[in-house]
Amino acid sequence: MEIKKLEAMIEAILFTMGEAVEVERIASALDHDVDTIRKIIHNMMDRYEGDERGIKIIELDNSFQMCTKAQMYEAIVKIAHVPKKHILTDVLLESLSIIAYKQPITKQQIESIRGVKSDHAVNKLVEYNLVCEVGRMDAPGRPILFGTTEDFLRNFGIASLEDLPVVAPEKVADFKMEAEEEVQLQLDI
């Protein structure tokens, strides 16, 4: 099958699905190997970025999705329903960061790291579809394990969790020292 026809079929699949589609599913549907399909999609991504188009293809973990470019927001908002913007407070961002870096993680483990109850924060993050239940821990009570979602990757503009910034060891030491000082201050009061 020629490249142009494969590109057209990939484009049709991504457009029709409207959500991220695993590269393996695309390859299987087109009866081609995964590496060839991935290479074709990456070439398409480059072309979409270079052209004056309103859409692009993004990569999320091992999946691809067709979506609109951020620059098209002004035109789209005039015709489409504008979804309610979610406000990520410092508490939500802190909890989300812990989940993103430590997943899969239980609510109790999050609370242990934060030092305060995290029910509200985790529930809000689930409501915003940034985190979800990814399983249960094999421990008494079988606590729920949480992890990030594709919406998390999409909203933060990263392709996979490996793209999360690495926290420098000296920063970790600084944060640890600050936390210990804060705990000591609370004990002294």
Curated annotation (Swiss-Prot):
InterPro entries: ScpB_csome_segregation, WH-like_DNA-bd_sf, WH_DNA-bd_sf. It holds the Pfam family SMC_ScpB. Keywords: Cell cycle, Cell division, Chromosome partition, Cytoplasm. GO terms for cellular component: cytoplasm. The keyword Cytoplasm applies. It is found in: Cytoplasm. NCBIfam families: SMC-Scp complex subunit ScpB. Belongs to the ScpB family. Homodimer. Homodimerization may be required to stabilize the binding of ScpA to the Smc head domains. Component of a cohesin-like complex composed of ScpA, ScpB and the Smc homodimer, in which ScpA and ScpB bind to the head domain of Smc. The presence of the three proteins is required for the association of the complex with DNA. Participates in chromosomal partition during cell division. May act via the formation of a condensin-like complex containing Smc and ScpA that pull DNA away from mid-cell into both cell halves. This is Segregation and condensation protein B.
